[in-house]
UniProtKB/Swiss-Prot annotation:
Keyword set includes Membrane: yes
Motif (Nucleotide carrier signature motif): 316-321
Protein's UniProt name: ADP,ATP carrier protein, mitochondrial
Ranges: Solcar repeats: 84-177, 189-281, 289-375
Membrane topology: Multi-pass membrane protein
Quaternary state and interactors: Monomer.
Organism: Solanum tuberosum
Keywords carried by this UniProt record: Antiport, Membrane, Mitochondrion, Mitochondrion inner membrane, Repeat, Transit peptide, Transmembrane, Transmembrane helix, Transport
Location(s), subcellular: Mitochondrion inner membrane
A cellular component annotation (GO) from this entry: mitochondrial inner membrane
Amino acids binding ADP: 159, 171, 316
Keyword Disulfide bond carried by entry: no
Organismal lineage: Eukaryota, Viridiplantae, Streptophyta, Embryophyta, Tracheophyta
Activity regulation, short description: The matrix-open state (m-state) is inhibited by the membrane-permeable bongkrekic acid (BKA). The cytoplasmic-open state (c-state) is inhibited by the membrane-impermeable toxic inhibitor carboxyatractyloside (CATR).
Length: 386
């Protein structure tokens, strides 16, 4: 990753030709911070981890990371372009992040409800399992109202700003610390340095904003429970913090943090591993300089890495859901084994379909918003994802 500026990829060529930068895994790179090839440094905000941000769409996307799925976009730091320009890009990126996240919030909440429904069933906050994406949408609107589809979105939007600031603070430090070059040090040392720098930067940023991701998850999964008198568990963002700190202390806000850090490494390893393996095989001949072929490969790799690492996102969010409950998982490994034993391996992928659909919503909104910025303001500013 350190030498990508010296050796432009097909993604970068395509981005230069069409001035298009995307950000696919919001929860996956947000979730899983890091830097992706140029065209994916602006993820089509769909989530954790992201994104994957991949937020980072930020390919930072936080995709994401995703995001994530979860996955934020890196714009140039103040010393590189001047504080005024940096502040403008930072604020406009925040507006773009708010627009894209808010537009994709309904499918994001449905994804989280389906993903964590078994924890809600055990806690008595869900009467029966969801039968699919459409049925979940219908039940949520019928039982809680149309506006409830945006529950938890405020915390998700707020998370963008500290994540961006922290990325600026950490990215250059870790880039210098693991400054391996592919042509100088060899592929494997470069690859290991890439994972180490991305993982360290992502984990460092995640440490400061994880509680917001936790609060977003709890609010999105806080449905009106008929068995509990139709009352919600939390009255808002501040109430999540107050009740969690009272019942579980600081540890309650960080449940699932360790496996989230592992997820950053796994996602980045899968992403760059597949990219380096498939690019020289598939992008040959006339396809080498084709924007659509490059974009298609990037979309395939981003979703492939996000899907392969999705069980980690499920485990971490299922662990989040046990804060304040009488029975908790002893560790991420215990959570993984219990989920597989009691619910089957398929349960680890619940909500994955909605996670992929979120990319479509994010892509359309970001593309339209970019066009609006050009028409109204005369230029396109940085935008955020995860």
């Amino acid at each position: 990753m350190a030498d990508m500026n010296q050796h432009p990829t097909v993604f970068q060529k395509a981005a230069n030709q069409l001035d298009l930068r995307s950000s696919l895994s919001q929860d996956v790179h947000a979730r899983y911070g890091g830097v992706q090839p140029a065209i994916y440094q602006r993820h089509f905000a769909y989530g954790n981890y992201s994104n994957a941000g991949l937020q980072r769409g930020q390919a930072t996307q936080d995709l994401s990371l995703i995001t994530s799925n979860a996955s934020p976009v890196f714009v140039q730091a103040p010393q590189e372009k001047g504080f005024a320009a940096f502040a403008t890009d930072f604020l406009m990126g925040g507006v773009s992040a708010a627009v894209s996240k808010t537009a994709a919030a309904p499918i994001e909440r449905v994804k989280l409800l389906i993903q964590n429904q078994d924890e809600m069933l055990k806690a008595g906050r869900l009467s029966e399992p969801y039968k699919g994406i459409g049925e979940c949408f219908g039940r949520t609107i019928k039982e809680e109202g149309f506006g409830s589809l945006w529950r938890g979105n405020t915390a998700n939007v707020i998370r963008y700003f500290p994540t961006q600031a922290l990325n600026f603070a950490f990215k250059d430090y870790f880039k210098r610390l693991f400054n391996f070059k592919k042509d100088r040090d060899g592929y494997w040392k470069w690859f290991a340095g890439n994972l180490a720098s991305g993982g360290a930067a992502g984990a460092s940023s995640l440490f400061f904003v994880y509680s917001l991701d936790y609060a977003r998850t709890r609010l999105a999964n806080d449905r009106k429970a008929s068995k509990k008198g139709g009352e919600r568990q939390f009255n808002g963002l501040v109430d999540v913090y107050k009740k969690t700190l009272k019942s579980d202390g600081i540890a309650g806000l960080y449940r699932g943090f360790n496996i989230s850090c592992v997820g950053i490494i796994v996602y980045r390893g899968l992403y760059f591993g597949m990219y380096d393996s498939l690019k020289p095989v598939l992008l040959t001949g006339n396809l080498q300089d084709s924007f659509f072929a490059s974009f298609g490969l990037g979309w395939l790799i981003t979703n492939g890495a996000g899907l392969a690492s999705y069980p980690i996102d499920t485990v971490r969010r299922r662990m989040m859901m046990t804060s304040g409950e009488a029975v908790k998982y002893k560790s991420s490994l215990d959570a993984f084994s219990q989920i597989v034993k009691n619910e089957g391996p398929k349960s680890l992928f619940k909500g994955a379909g909605a996670n992929i659909l979120r990319a479509v919503a994010g892509a359309g909104v970001l593309a339209g918003y970019d066009k609006l910025q050009v028409l109204v303001l005369g230029k396109k500013f940085g935008s955020g994802g995860a």
